[in-house]
Amino acid sequence: MDSLSENEFRSLLQQGQLTELHRRLDLEKVDSGSAERLALNAQFLFKTGQIESSKAIYTLLANEQGNWSARLNLGHCEKALGNHQQAAVHYRALAEGEDASRQAIAYWSLANMKDRLLDKDDRLKLIEMLALNDLSPAARALANFTLGILEEESGDFGAAFGYLTEANDLIAMNRPWRGDAYQQLIHRLMQFAGEARHRAETNVVRPVFIVGMPRSGTTLVEQILAAHSEVEATDELLYLDQVSRSLEETVGGYAKRIKRLTSEEMRRWQQFYAESSALHCSDTKPVRIDKNPNNFLHVALIMALFPHAKIVNLVRP
């Protein structure tokens, strides 16, 4: 029996401390407990790639009247399993609800499947949604993103650009963007990446990192490599991002901290990555893939911690 309170569980989930959760959870009892605890268990299982187990819990919760969140996450599980038709059934049911903010999430989930599941009636409902004065900025942004995709699919690129611009402007209100600071970070990381391979040695793990801009073909390359009997695909892991955030919070910032990592710190982060990524692996295949397009920002960190790792960078002309 684990000793985790729901507050502790929630906090560890939010911090991405999945290895600590794995250590402290009684995995034989994840399908029992209060509705709140079951939802937390399902989140943990989903985040560690145990989608079928997560789906089973969300199915139980979704049968409870009014459990909107469970129905949404059940759709996410079906999508992750490749069952797009069933995922669409769940999303569509939620889009027919009464709460505009929840409808916006459901419509975006449908649009984000890239299966052209929305029609003219949906477009009109989304436009009506934007006319609501009490629609939250987050929901308004999702509605604009969804309309942007709809207009792009119809060939009206001018209208699509307008909706996408509005959506990004809404997001920027809460997450301001500083292009100059980002460019400075990239230049500092590029200067360091060339010398990073000579700084660390490790036999902990030697993953294959697949990076590149979104929609560049990273998923296809992952599927091709994972067809090999000794290669295992994992998920779009966020552990490098966790390391980068921890380094960013220290004196000097991300780029400078990579350059100043001590041998002890490198061993600690190597072990953290190895243990965390192992949660997504079966232990039967020697090579694991970490496919996350956004990890292009962490190439210098990869070179510092895993000098013998393979990095596949996808560029789409």
Give the positions of each predicted feature.
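TPR-repeat structural position
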Residues: 18-19, 51, 84, 120-123, ...
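Phosphate-binding active sites in nucleotide-utilizing proteins
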Residues: 200-306, 310-314
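Structural register within alpha-helical repeat arrays
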Residues: 8, 41, 74, 107-110, ...
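Residue at a conserved register position within TPR or TPR-like alpha-solenoid repeats
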Residues: 12, 45, 78, 113-114, ...
